[in-house]
Amino acid sequence: TGGALMARGAGVPACGRVDELTSTVDIYKILGKLAGYPIDAPYLDGNLPEVLGGQRRAYTVSNSIYPGQTYKLAVRTHDHALRLETQEKVDEDGTVDFAGARVGIYPRAHELEEDYALDSAELRAFFYPRARDFVREIANNGEFWPAMRAARPEWFGGQP
């Protein structure tokens, strides 16, 4: 999203300004590499950026998932971003109904600006499978626990 990632200390190479996609989970591999620990364990999430000897990311994923709020997803490449927001709020079990979600693909410099929305089979073929894979575990397809929905007004101060 344009956030800065900076590491400074003994043994940290001076890389200057680097234009590379990173994710917050990359910090584990970055710090592990800089501290001299092995970073190839299969349980270790993240990516070592190319500037530190790893591989450049093709895309990053960020999301906002809080019960009582709409779900938001961004899948970003260097040049484009898929942005998604559900109409329904995230349920207390962490699932959400994606029916009617607003989805658009935009140039990175114009995210969420509808005048810049792109409709391209090539971009859809890249972004849609990645977004689907990411939300597969939280999509409830409109099926939810009825007792939980009945209790929602009490939990959220009268809001359905």
Residues of each region from the PLM?
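Substrate-binding rim/cap in mid-to-C-terminal beta-strand-loop elements of soluble/periplasmic
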Residues: 1-54
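Generic alpha-helix detector with strongest preference for long hydrophobic helices that associate
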Residues: 8-12, 29, 63, 108, ...
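C-terminal accessory region downstream of the catalytic core in glycan-modifying enzymes
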Residues: 32, 79-160
